Amino acid sequence: MQPCACVAHVSTRKVEYMFLPKLKFLHHLLKALVAPCRTAQPGAFSALALLHRCGAVVLLGVVTLHAAAQQDPAFAHYWQLEPQLNPATVGRTPQLNIAAALQMHAAGYEDGGSTMYAGADMAFQIGKTRHGVGAIFQNDEFGLFSHKRFSVQYAYHLKLWGGTLSIGAEADMLNESVQGSKADLGDANDPAFPSTDLSGSKFDASVGVYYAHRHWYAGLAAQHLTAPTVFLGETNEYKVKRLYNFIGGYNIKLRNSFFTIAPSTLLRYDGSAFRADITARVLYEHQKRRLYAGLTYSPQHSVTGFVGGSFHGVDLSYSYEANTSGMGLGAGQHEITLGYRLDLKLGKKGKNLHRSVRYL
């Protein structure tokens, strides 16, 4: 009989609850290692030696993943979901913009988790001043953990230096929850993990600035300004880190062609972990139809391929993010993004509030 890789009693007490929600690989590792123990016969392995071995593996996974992971979800189609990153981007175009995205994590793994995003924003004009409002809902689930965010956003848009300067702010309600009643850790009395369902909420805030010129754009935002600590019961807590991000891009229109090259980048830093997404897209646009494809490279994280298009105001795109570390290429993320734009006649008729240089 093969040795049983049992970690039912590994020192999970050393793993702080605040780190658990993002340790996706650890979750699957624990589940895979615990399962064989349920059918193992006594004496089939040396418990003490195995405990030390498994404990080292688990703690190594904890340290590695915590050092590399950020708390907020990373969408592959970040240029389509800019309000998720920066409140200054709401109301930048004269249409009502509706966007939704679904990301499935850890392909091939049971309970790999998913992230859902839904948002809408619109522009309006008061006198000669231009404004934007929006709202988003986001639900990030992984195993027994759930992270929800509801935000209302406002932006002020000002013509400046031949482009548009936008300043935005948002108010957030964060909710963290864990289904402790569904946990199967072998030891029902283990105090390291809650045995009942717990949840907690806290208010938060974010701010951002964004500048768009004819062919290029750039934005900077600070999220989770209050860095709240969400309490779940009396003994568990989840500490939210401040997150700073920069987004920028340039549209290069090829001469005598329907093609545009649109490089862009997204940089994120939360005080301990840094992530850079470097994207190259090729767009074909003709007779109100737009098709695009491209690649994103995130050093030490992943490579993403995507394809999509726009038809009569409806945007549909798909991507697959292959991990270059951790669980490997086959355990990546599938993502589908859907968008819709509806023309609104607010403010002065016949005049667009401002044009967007961002290609969806």
Task: Give the ranges of each region predicted by the language model.
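Cleavable N-terminal export/targeting peptides
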Residues: M1-D72, D343-L360
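Subset of outer-membrane beta-barrel
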Residues: Q70-L360
